[in-house]
Structure formats: C-alpha cells, structure tokens
Amino acid sequence: GPNIKNQECDLLVAVGMRFDDRVTGTPAHFGANAKVIHLEIDPAEIGKIIPADVAVVGDVKRSLPLITERIRKRDHSQWIAGFRACDQIEYEAVIRKAVHPAEGRIRMGEAVAAVARAYRNDAVLVTDVGQQQMNAARYFGFRRTRSVVTSGGLGTMGFGLPAAIGAKLGAPDREVVLFAGDGGLQMTIQELGTIFQSKIPVKIVLLN
C-alpha cells in the first residue's frame, strides 16, 4: 500500500526525515512523480538522498504551520479506501504466506505472528537490529498507539535488551516483548543480570 501510494503521489512533504534506505529502497524510484518539500532542522540532510524541490531548514514547530495553514479541507475517503484495498492485496500475496506454517522450518514472519496472536496484538513491541526488526515491524500488527520501541535509523545492534527493560519500567501494566537476533542480544546480554536482580518480566524472542 505505502509503496503504491508513494508512486502515485504528486506532492511529498517530508518532515524531519533523512530518507534512509529502509524507507526509500532505490532512491531513483522513490516518489518518482512527486515534487518534494523537505522540512529538516539539519541542513546536511537536505538533498543528500532525495533532491528537494522546496527545502525548509529549521524547527518544524515553526515551519510546518506555514504549510498546514494553506491546506484546504478535502474528502480523502476514496483515497483511504484505495489504501485499504492495497493492504488486502498485500496480505493475500505476501503476508499470508509469511505468517502461516511452512513445512520443515519456522519462518520469522510465522514466529512473529504467533507471538502477536498470543498477546492479542496488545503488547509493547521492542526490537533489536536486523532481519527480526524488519519482520517484527511487518508482521506483528498493532491495536494501540505508543506500542513500538525500535532504534529505527540509528541502526545500533544491542539496542533491544536495554530498551525492553526501559519499556517495561515505563509501562509496568503492559506485556513487553523483545525480538532480537543472537548477535545483537550478545552485545548487551549482561542486562539479563539487571532483569534477574530487579525482577523485570521482559519476554525475549530470539530469532536466528
């Protein structure tokens, strides 16, 4: 859905983003038909990956209202319906195959979906960095806001376990599930001692 709509759009407003490769894929194909307005506090990010037709350097708290105050209210129900239709097509073509059992092995998408079902998609999701991060983001599914903690563009392995501890301390009434790979987990594995000593009930799913 997002990829299709990205190719259809004629105006792309980028607010405080650096267009990293996990967002753009091949830069030449990203929003190929769109004019780009890039709002960013760091001038070094302007035009670094995606050329900007209009560049606005500064705090978006001040710059974004200059755009939004000029926008007229419109009915986007048809656009949203088209987006949802794309979601359904993607589910049938890609996601269904990834989350259902495969003979002889357990795929990452299948494991993520099984954990999501166990927690009724209501847990706080924390990820380390790697393929499990991508699979968790795609196949976990969410029902509530403020439910994802991930390093995003920082891309720092070892982020997951300390972040999961922090998430549980910040939301003690919610289950916290960490998806990690063996490399990232080992980088901060000493925090298992913190979990044991402080009795912090974080669930860890190791996907190798």
Please provide the spans of the model-predicted regions.
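Glycine-rich, anion-gripping cofactor-binding loops and their flanking helix/strand elements
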Residues: 1-37, 143-174, 188-190
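Thiamine diphosphate
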Residues: 3-8, 198-208
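Generic beta-sheet signal
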Residues: 15, 39, 151, 179, ...
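Short glycine-rich anion-binding loops that position phosphate/pyrophosphate groups of nucleotides
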Residues: 17-20, 130-132, 183
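Active-site diphosphate/adenylate-binding microenvironment
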Residues: 87-167
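DG-centered beta-turn motif at the end of beta-strands
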Residues: 173-194, 207
